[in-house]
């Protein structure tokens, strides 16, 4: 029989378990790439597609979070997914699972970009008009002013 006390055996068990868990955590930390490293390892076509659709995915995630908040505030069971069609129910399997219409999203984004460009052009026009007005404004004592 073993003459070692019970606490010693349990201490060994906890130490061994801690070593196993610590090894797993360290392996996870040092082998998992960061988001930047992962994106950098993509091929140029996939990276371009990722960057192009980044805003769309963020908007879709925001829409999903709004649906989750609405669903959590209701008294219905968790498995009722609200406006999202459940793939587990027969009558909802063929429903569109997209939360946001991609074409509408791109159209709205293009309109916002166009509006920004128009605002920027108007600001530049005002600045040019202000500079032109200052150039026209000449003083009689200034021999270098153009009249």
From Swiss-Prot:
Residues 88-139 form a coiled coil. Belongs to the CBP4 family. This is Assembly factor CBP4. It holds the Pfam family CBP4. It is a single-pass membrane protein. It is found in: Mitochondrion inner membrane. Keywords: Chaperone, Coiled coil, Membrane, Mitochondrion, Mitochondrion inner membrane, Transmembrane, Transmembrane helix. Essential for the assembly of ubiquinol-cytochrome c reductase. It has a direct effect on the correct occurrence of the Rieske protein, core 4, core 5 and apocytochrome b. It comes from Scheffersomyces stipitis (strain ATCC 58785 / CBS 6054 / NBRC 10063 / NRRL Y-11545) (Yeast). The lineage of its organism: Eukaryota, Fungi, Dikarya, Ascomycota, Saccharomycotina.
